[in-house]
Amino acid sequence: MAITDWPVHERPREKLLQRGPNALSDAELLAIFLRTGVAGKTAVDLARELLESFGSLRALLEADLKQFCHAPGLGIAKYTQLQACLEMGRRHLEDTLKRGDVLTDPQTTQRYLVARLRAYPFEVFSCLFLDNRHRVLAFEELFRGTIDGASVHPREVLKRALAHNAAAVILAHNHPSGVAEPSRADECITQRLKEALALVDIRVLDHIIVGDGETLSFAERGLL
């Protein structure tokens, strides 16, 4: 049966308009993105099959081009459309950060860092540069490494902070292992960066570790 033959309150698009996106299942949200199904299958049927094939909505959203296009009903056009949607979401979070004090909205800050860093299969060290009112000036990915770690150079972090005329920074990196607990090396580099930046009166407000579904704040843990 075609979706247009379903009761109005069960159709994904109408359901979203009436009850909001939170009321929809992963399959229903994906069906709206797909718009159409394939021969003999509605968009919802196809969405359910794709979620089962990839294992989760997150796995589908983070699939590379080859994996994505190999799935039935998907292709380059859908891949580019999806990447555009994901990037708009990241930019919306970034714009939200830039309009306020990151210390008064730490959840948005952490959601943004998760969106930027979680999917990497290797370690990425990044930095949020802030003005004297703790508003975001810029976000930069500074160092990339392997699954086990990334080499961080305080001189380069200092150079970029001065280039942005930053008054404070929030450090961040991901743990591809998914575990957000800090290593001894994480604690050491945080202290080195804190000391180096203090020489030019730039404060390290926090160091966020992004894991799989969790984050850790050095400030909240008392490690700064």
Swiss-Prot record:
Q: Name one GO biological process term.
A: proteolysis
Q: Where is the MPN domain?
A: 102-224
**Which is one GO molecular function term here?**
metal ion binding
Q: Where is this motif: JAMM motif?
A: 173-186
Q: Which UniProt keywords apply?
A: Hydrolase, Metal-binding, Metalloprotease, Protease, Zinc
Domain of life of the source: Bacteria
Please state what the protein is called. Answer: UPF0758 protein Noc_0236
